[in-house]
A protein has these predicted regions:
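Short amphipathic alpha-helical face segments that pack within enzyme cores
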Residues: 53, 162-166
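Secondary-structure boundary elements
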Residues: 98-101, 128-135, 169-176
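Metal-dependent nuclease catalytic regions and adjoining charged, substrate-binding loops involved
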Residues: 83-90, 154-158, 166-248
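Short histidine-centered catalytic/ligand-binding loop motif
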Residues: 40-43, 75-78, 146-158, 195-198
Length: 248
């Protein structure tokens, strides 16, 4: 049985696919596999920790988060500036009645299921049974971003639409998926964002088309493809040829 304590255990990470795993495989198969096997660890950036700080508040695990991440404090024991800003973000969100309503569901609800016969695990930030699935995101801002030559919503760039499709499929009741979002700007912006069902359906088809290959990679049945751009690929790169500067 999966619990909050063993959700990210090596055994469960290998046994189950997750939304974050799937997105990692879409970005770089080799890097995703190395991370699952414990051969590579993503850098714990300040930006990531600020978002996790806000998450921990809503999970009611902030004291534990502080204990596990002493780097968020100065030598004198005060919160560093970035995490004081996280406190301000929380304060701002708590002043908004609608935001709090969507975040008032059951917290960190774990569910398992299958997509294309592949086991998946999900953890829902705020679950309103029979009504909606809500996921909390804290980001730099709400501006569109460039990816592969296209200017896209951050929802598409970070794969939150794919996450929504997976959550909806595993929850099993075709519930609407919403993002409660806040920015890390000096004066935080906030929004409740819906993703249309046709977009979720499109993303679920993407998952179905790729998940068997990713599962076979996890099982060692096929070799992962390297992207040659991520930190893992850079750290394990072996030069085999000389390249022309115009190819850079």
């Amino acid at each position: 049985m999966i619990t909050s304590e063993n959700y990210f255990s090596p055994e469960n990470n290998m046994k189950y696919m997750s939304a974050s795993q799937f997105k990692a495989f879409m970005n770089c198969e080799a890097g995703a596999l190395a991370e699952i096997k414990g051969e590579f660890e993503r850098e714990k950036t300040t930006s990531l920790l600020v978002g996790s700080y806000v998450d921990a508040h809503y999970e009611k695990t902030l004291d534990l988060f502080k204990a596990q991440n002493p780097e968020i404090f100065t030598q004198k024991g005060a919160l560093k500036a970035e995490y004081k800003q996280a406190e301000y973000i929380i304060e701002r969100l708590e002043r908004d009645e609608l935001f709090q309503k969507y975040m008032s569901g059951e917290k960190q609800v774990i569910k398992t299921g299958e997509i294309e016969s592949i086991p998946f695990k999900i953890k829902i930030d705020s679950y309103h049974p029979g009504k909606v699935i809500v996921d909390l995101k804290v980001m730099r801002d709400f501006e569109q971003m460039w990816k592969d030559g296209l200017k896209l919503s951050f929802v598409e760039v970070w794969g939150y639409d794919i996450q929504g499709a997976i959550y909806q499929a595993i929850e099993g009741n075709n519930l609407p998926f919403f993002i409660t979002a806040a920015t890390k700007e000096k004066e935080p912006d906030l929004a409740i964002i819906s993703i249309p069902q046709d977009r979720l359906d499109y993303c679920l088809n993407q998952v179905k088309e790729n998940v068997k290959r990713f599962d076979d990679i996890k099982k060692g049945l096929i070799e992962p493809t390297r992207c040659e751009h991520c930190d893992y690929c850079k750290s394990t790169k072996v030069l085999t040829e000389i390249i022309d500067y115009t190819s850079l």
